[in-house]
């Protein structure tokens, strides 16, 4: 058994956040429980615009060294939101089995592109589990 606190940077109004990665020592737990904590008052501010992060061109390439690289592009589309210096985008890779259950996740970070422009990303994975489908999601970081 273990416990891990995962803090996410920001969520825009009505935005769904997908967070993928590994926790613990890599051993699949029997159960997973999530608890959303109430933020401290100083962490809640009025939205200063919004941003969305569409992903396109996602593909996979099997590498000669046994790894698999998932590639794609992510755009930053803002409506009044101004990123701070050094602001990044987190890209999460999600693998699903034939029942649609999430069985694996990994992540990468990319620099924030100019508004409406794309930034390429690559997520290298070794020892993939058997999976049926994959998808990627992006969020502000």
Language model features by range: what are they?
Residues 40-104:
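Surface-exposed interaction/gating patches
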Residues 4, 19, 70-72, 89-91, ...:
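Hydrophobic residues positioned within well-ordered beta-strands of beta-sheet architectures
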Residues 12, 27, 63-65, 84, ...:
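Surface-exposed coil/turn segments at beta-strand junctions on protein surfaces, enriched
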Residues 24, 75-77, 126:
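Acidic, Ser/Thr
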Residues 84-85, 90-92, 96-97, 101-102, ...:
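C-terminal functional regions that serve as terminal interaction/effector modules
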Residues 1, 27-32, 92-93:
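Intrinsic low-complexity repeat tracts in disordered regions, enriched in small/polar residues
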Residues 8, 23-63, 105, 128-141:
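Terminal connector regions
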Residues 2-22, 102-124:
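A cross-kingdom feature marking solvent-exposed beta-strand/loop segments within repeated
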């Amino acid at each position: 058994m273990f416990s891990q606190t995962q803090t996410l940077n920001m969520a825009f109004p009505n935005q769904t956040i997908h967070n993928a990665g590994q926790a613990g020592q890599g051993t699949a737990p029997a159960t997973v429980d999530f608890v959303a904590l109430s933020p401290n008052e100083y962490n809640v501010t009025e939205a200063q615009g919004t941003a969305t992060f569409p992903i396109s061109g996602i593909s996979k390439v099997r590498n000669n060294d046994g790894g698999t690289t998932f590639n794609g592009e992510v755009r930053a589309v803002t409506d009044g939101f101004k990123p701070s210096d050094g602001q990044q985008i987190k890209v999460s890779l999600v693998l699903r089995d034939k029942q649609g259950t999430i069985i694996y996740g990994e992540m990468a970070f990319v620099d924030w592109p100019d508004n409406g422009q794309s930034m390429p990303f690559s997520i290298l994975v070794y020892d993939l589990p058997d999976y049926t489908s994959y998808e990627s999601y992006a969020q502000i970081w």
